Amino acid sequence: VHVQLNTKSKIFSSDNNGFGNQPNSDVGAITMAHPGTLPLVSKEVIDMGMKLGIALGGTITRNLVFDRKNYFYPDLPKGYQITQDATPICKGGTVKIRRDDCPHFDIKLTKIHLEEDAGKSIHVKNTDFTNLDLNRSGVPLLEIVTEPMIASSEQAGLCLTELRKLVRYLDISDGNMERGSLRLSLIHISEPTRPY
């Protein structure tokens, strides 16, 4: 689950973090990785990551370490993404599903880590053209990684609903899925004896 954070600036620069602004108007030298620029992580982003980790019962890491994930994609102007891999801001934790209309269950978390978002490709209808809006590039994200224990689409939906309520309650994200503030990537893992 990717959670876009409600911050005034981007994760590693003072560029504006706003939704719906004129395309490519909130992109500065650090976001573009111009020579001589150095990223500096936002304290506000760190605080939000710790707040969510504590709320989910995880263990907060004492040292922040960031990695470069290198890949080429048109909406990634630097050619790499700054993320956390081996040393996430939070390890473990649990999303507790407690509702009257279904059995109670827990979804265990592997980690919560900080990273920057990529830009946005906008495919122009009825043409072969794709436009790029790099305003989203560098926007702070929390990525929540669960253990492979979600057994159904219903459980996935309940987990996402609980996370959405929590990030809104903690005021770290508006959780607006329509605007991309809360995004979900599913990976299907099946047992060898039970394919799909």
Language-model segments: which ranges?
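Basic, nucleic-acid-interacting segments
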Residues: 2-185, 190, 194
